[in-house]
């Protein structure tokens, strides 16, 4: 929130310098992002009055003006399009020094002498750009220093408030806070009730009291919108980051900054028969003040009349019901909208307004009538008019209940590490408007004021005590606690260990966004119902990833486009799946390889990566947890139908690997074969604890087996059959050759496999090996129709 320091000091003026005030506010938990002078240094600029304007004899776009400083008249050549006789403007006389040490001197412009310069907001450093002279109020005293008249030695303070401190989104809230910090008695300025001059009321009906517990309105007839907004109000709004629009809108914005209550003004003559606060009808549309047409979501509260929607409640008004220069009668709205009903509504339409910012966090539900009286007072002063009586619709059962919070005196001392007597604690909290509801032997029950939505439990009160006491005054003590070192179970496999292993095999870690392109996800996981964002950062970041491949493939494309011919990447992170109406978050580990299998070198042969490279990497990786690992052929929509496998642990699927489907590779502009894997980390987080086995001193016995089987039979099935039939003394078996040719027949292949046996306590007999070998041959024949190769 931005505000003028002078404006704040009109409400409460502590005896502190600007720097000390900013530091105090920050140390109280209201972080000041910036505090800047309203205008950069300049001197010699006074309020001038333009007496006459004549055309320049030799330049169409220049004017020759007579300007008075209250004592003398000066001839000034001016090119501003809005210069006019009778207006009052900042006048830089000869000798004035503008920002940047630019000194005003007597000059001739196209042959006509100019004795000074008429200034715009840009020249006064009040704006980055301006289209013409800065008009001053008609009652501005001629000859007075502009810096003094506009109070340009003021500071703009920008406070970055946390969402729980919505009570400080106003001058009233900041003044309350500063008064409490400096022990200054504070009473908000009284707002007098304006008596009704006319009997006109506008019917109001609230159909959703749970979303709008209080609605206050008032008719004011006969307003004059041609009346200018006073200079003091324009300046206060500008220093709060709000541009002046017209007197009515400026007043509602002013009250919002002053009291924290957003308001809206409707053109009464554009409304049909009454105000209705309701939920929208299906498909209802509204053109907003910014010209954007929207279809109103079913959960969005609207302000309507009896024919059409007028505004998104608490967010933005509609284009056709706002005030204009033709408006003569207005209907003022001041309402309390429940924060939970407004949370996220503005963002769902891609909007963020000052009103929605306040309503989402919570406004004081007791201030709506006060705000409308303050706005009435200002409007009658500026645009005139005849006010009607105030209309108020209130559903007390739906208003927030005042929080009653218990506070133990001993707990205050315990958490803060400093002893504060009971009287001091009571006095501190009283300064913040917290009343003692009940006194007990060990503490109190406090009632929170209506503007503090963030106070609900004991630690909230202790935080307030700490803020007023001063965080910087709290003693610093080292925590004392037994810190026994508890080693992790040996079976636990850390993610860091897995990452380091992949790095040792030439992979590089990538970190990509969780939000990805919906189109990419529809290619990779078309069967999954993706989670989409209502208001994404960008159109290609609108969905939450269902696989880590989405980000890795984009990273691979980025590297490919930069002439990288060997890419090996991995990433760990969450994937997001819809399961039974809930969002399931699974920690995953994924990787990809493409390009050359080895870095280019004089002794390495050039070879492109293949399926067995990524399979070998996975086998090596999964040796860390000691998995009972196996693979089986599978199908995946993102992978090549003939080069896809499931990764199994103890027979249960834990991941998938394979070649990227050529169709997807072409769509994503990825060149050459690319191989991927993805594992569920939870499935490999618990490994097997290694157990010692003595090395047998007896010899190994190896037998080689060459069989002919169908081309389509995967070796993984053959390997499993060998393991199951070779007997208990089998140590291992390896495939060492694959042959295709006329000698084995069409649609056949020959597999050459070595099988090794060894007994831990004796030498195996030849007949035992022969029996085991024959069992293997028999099992392969029965299961796959395999025959020994002749």
Swiss-Prot record:
Cofactor note: Binds 2 magnesium ions per tetramer.
Enzyme class per UniProt: ligase
InterPro entries attached to this UniProt entry: aa-tRNA-synth_II/BPL/LPL (IPR045864), B3/B4_tRNA-bd (IPR005146), DNA-bd_dom_put_sf (IPR009061), Fdx_antiC-bd (IPR005121), Fdx_antiC-bd_sf (IPR036690), NA-bd_OB-fold (IPR012340), Phe-tRNA-ligase_IIc_bsu (IPR045060), Phe-tRNA-ligase_IIc_bsu_bact (IPR004532)
Residue ranges of domain tRNA-binding in the record: 39-147
Family in the record: Belongs to the phenylalanyl-tRNA synthetase beta subunit family. Type 1 subfamily.
Catalytic activity: tRNA(Phe) + L-phenylalanine + ATP = L-phenylalanyl-tRNA(Phe) + AMP + diphosphate + H(+)
ATP-binding keyword on record: yes
EC annotation from Swiss-Prot or TrEMBL: 6.1.1.20
Superkingdom assignment: Bacteria
Cofactor(s) the protein needs: Mg(2+)
Amino acids binding Mg(2+): 454, 460, 463-464
One Pfam family in the UniProt entry: tRNA_bind
Any one GO MF annotation of this record: tRNA binding
Compartments (UniProt record): Cytoplasm
Domain FDX-ACB: 696-789
Subunit structure: Tetramer of two alpha and two beta subunits.
Residue ranges of every copy of the B5 domain listed in the record: 400-476
Alphabetized SUPFAM superfamilies for the sequence: Anticodon-binding domain of PheRS, Class II aaRS and biotin synthetases, Nucleic acid-binding proteins, PheT/TilS domain, Putative DNA-binding domain
UniProt entry keywords in alphabetical sequence: Aminoacyl-tRNA synthetase, ATP-binding, Cytoplasm, Ligase, Magnesium, Metal-binding, Nucleotide-binding, Protein biosynthesis, RNA-binding, tRNA-binding
NCBIfam families the UniProt entry points to: pheT_bact, YtpR
One biological process term in Gene Ontology: phenylalanyl-tRNA aminoacylation
Protein name: Phenylalanine--tRNA ligase beta subunit
Main location: cytoplasm
Any GO CC annotation of this UniProt entry: phenylalanine-tRNA ligase complex
């Amino acid at each position: 929130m931005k505000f003028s320091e002078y404006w704040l000091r009109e409400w409460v003026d502590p005896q502190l310098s600007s720097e000390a005030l900013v530091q105090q506010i920050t140390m109280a938990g209201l972080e000041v992002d910036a505090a800047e002078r309203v205008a950069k240094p300049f001197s010699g600029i006074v309020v001038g009055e333009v007496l006459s304007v004549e055309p320049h004899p030799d330049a169409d776009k220049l004017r020759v003006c007579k300007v008075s400083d209250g004592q003398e008249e000066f001839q000034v050549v001016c090119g501003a399009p809005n210069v006019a006789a009778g207006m009052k403007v900042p006048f830089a006389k000869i000798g004035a020094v503008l920002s940047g040490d630019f000194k005003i001197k007597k000059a001739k412009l196209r042959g006509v002498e100019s004795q000074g310069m008429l200034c715009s907001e840009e020249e006064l450093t009040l704006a980055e750009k301006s289209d013409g002279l800065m008009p001053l109020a008609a009652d501005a005293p001629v000859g007075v220093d502009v810096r003094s008249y506009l109070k340009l030695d003021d500071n703009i303070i920008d406070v970055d408030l946390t969402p729980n401190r919505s009570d400080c989104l106003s001058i009233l809230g900041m003044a309350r806070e500063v008064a409490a910090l400096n022990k200054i008695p504070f009473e908000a300025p009284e707002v007098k009730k304006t008596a009704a001059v006319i009997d006109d009321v506008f019917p109001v009906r609230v159909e959703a009291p749970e979303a709008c517990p209080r609605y206050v309105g008032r008719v004011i007839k006969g307003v004059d919108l041609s009346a200018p907004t006073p200079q003091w109000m324009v300046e206060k709004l500008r220093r709060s980051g709000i541009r002046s629009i017209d007197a009515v809108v400026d007043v509602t914005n002013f009250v919002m900054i002053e009291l924290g209550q957003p308001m809206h003004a409707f053109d009464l003559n554009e409304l049909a028969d009454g105000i209705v606060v309701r939920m929208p009808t299906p498909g209802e549309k509204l053109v907003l003040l910014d010209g954007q047409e929207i279809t109103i979501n079913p959960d969005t509260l609207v302000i309507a009349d009896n024919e059409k929607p007028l505004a998104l409640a608490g967010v933005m008004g509609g284009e056709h019901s706002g005030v204009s220069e033709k408006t003569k009668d207005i209907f003022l709205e001041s309402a309390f909208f429940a924060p939970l009903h407004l949370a996220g509504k503005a963002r769902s339409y891609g909007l963020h307004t000052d009103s929605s910012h306040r309503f989402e966090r919570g406004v004081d539900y007791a201030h709506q009538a006060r705000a409308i009286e303050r706005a009435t007072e200002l409007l009658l002063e500026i645009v005139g008019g005849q006010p009607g009586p105030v209309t108020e619709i209130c559903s007390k059962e739906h208003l927030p209940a005042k929080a009653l919070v218990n506070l133990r005196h001993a707990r205050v001392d315990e958490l803060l590490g400093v002893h504060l007597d009971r009287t001091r604690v009571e006095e501190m909290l009283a300064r913040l408007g917290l009343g003692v509801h009940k006194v007990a032997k060990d503490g109190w029950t406090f009632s929170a004021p209506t503007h503090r939505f963030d106070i609900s439990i004991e630690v909230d009160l202790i935080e307030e005590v700490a803020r007023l006491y001063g965080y910087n005054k709290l003693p610093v003590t080292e925590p004392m606690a037994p810190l026994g070192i508890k080693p992790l179970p040996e079976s636990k496999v850390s993610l860091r260990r897995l990452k380091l292993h992949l790095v040792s095999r030439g992979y590089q870690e990538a970190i990509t966004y969780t939000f990805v392109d919906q189109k990419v996800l529809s290619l990779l996981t078309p069967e999954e119902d993706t989670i989409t964002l209502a208001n994404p950062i960008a159109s290609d970041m609108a969905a939450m990833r269902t696989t880590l491949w989405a980000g890795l493939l984009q990273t691979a494309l980025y590297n490919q486009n930069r002439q990288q011919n060997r890419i090996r990447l991995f990433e760990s992170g969450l994937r997001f799946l819809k399961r039974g109406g809930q969002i399931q978050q699974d920690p995953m580990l994924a990787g990809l390889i493409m390009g050359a299998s080895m870095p280019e070198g004089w002794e390495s042969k050039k070879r492109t990566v293949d399926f067995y490279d990524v399979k070998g990497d996975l086998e090596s990786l999964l040796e860390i947890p000691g998995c009972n690992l196996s693979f089986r052929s599978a199908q995946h929509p993102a992978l090549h139908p003939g080069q896809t496998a499931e990764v199994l642990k103890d027979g249960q699927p834990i991941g998938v690997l394979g070649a990227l489907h050529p169709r997807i590779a072409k769509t994503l502009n990825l060149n050459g074969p690319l191989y991927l894997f993805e594992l569920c980390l939870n499935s490999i987080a618990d490994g097997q604890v290694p157990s010692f086995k003595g090395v047998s001193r007896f010899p190994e016995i190896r037998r080689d087996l060459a069989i002919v089987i169908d081309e389509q039979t995967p070796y993984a099935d053959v390997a499993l059959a060998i393991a199951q039939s070779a007997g208990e003394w089998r140590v291992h078996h390896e495939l060492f050759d694959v042959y295709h040719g006329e000698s084995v027949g069409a649609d056949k292949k020959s597999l050459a496999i070595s099988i090794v046996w060894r007994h831990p306590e004796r030498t195996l007999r030849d007949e035992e090996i022969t029996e085991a070998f024959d069992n293997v041959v028999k099992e392969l024949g029965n299961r796959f129709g395999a025959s020994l190769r002749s």
